[in-house]
């Protein structure tokens, strides 16, 4: 049983030769520790040493002709409360007029190549879709929460644009990737203090 078959069996509720294993998505500070332990800076070799069954292959596919980011939050700092482009927005028209990402700028060539050469591992993929994080970055966390009450229509409009882009991006990606992927990797949480 190879890595891919193992996780497919586990997810289907069928017997497998052992428990599945995924190292996860280590923090950048962890990789030097692992590299030192295993004596290599080749992350794939490290994953093989762990006998890791899965490779999370994310589409890094947005190529704006002017090299703009997929979502241009225009944040004023790194902290969660740092205001973004909509920190002071009170108009749905302003939200709609924003330069939202265009799915026509997606190019899945490199992602498809990575999926094709991933080997016998289980391959979850797709756009991760951290909607709440992205929307919070557009406002700043505190502004986001306040505007949910004071300007709910503005928050809904930003959320709609973010979600609609991800839906279309994933629709296009799944149409191209087909059975090269085993599962959709969806990650999102809305944790507060």
What is each model feature region?
Residues 1-193:
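Catalytic cores of TIM-barrel enzymes
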């Amino acid at each position: 049983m190879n890595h891919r078959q193992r996780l497919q069996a586990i997810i289907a509720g069928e017997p497998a030769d052992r428990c599945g294993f995924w190292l996860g998505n280590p923090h950048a500070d962890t990789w030097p520790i692992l590299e030192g332990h295993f004596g290599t800076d080749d992350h794939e070799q490290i994953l093989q040493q762990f006998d890791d069954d899965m490779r999370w292959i994310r589409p890094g596919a947005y190529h704006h002709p002017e090299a703009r980011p997929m979502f241009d939050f225009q944040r004023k700092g790194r902290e969660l409360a740092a205001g973004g482009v909509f920190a002071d927005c009170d108009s749905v028209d302003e939200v709609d007029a924003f330069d939202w990402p265009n799915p026509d700028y997606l190019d899945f060539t490199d992602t498809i190549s990575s999926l094709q050469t991933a080997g016998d591992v289980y391959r979850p993929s797709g756009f991760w879709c951290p909607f709440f994080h992205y929307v919070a970055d557009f406002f700043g966390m505190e502004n986001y929460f306040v505007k949910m009450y004071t300007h709910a229509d503005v928050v809904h409009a930003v959320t709609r644009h973010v979600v609609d882009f991800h839906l279309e991006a994933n629709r296009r990606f799944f149409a191209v990737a087909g059975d090269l992927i085993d599962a959709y990797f969806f990650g999102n949480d809305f944790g507060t203090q």
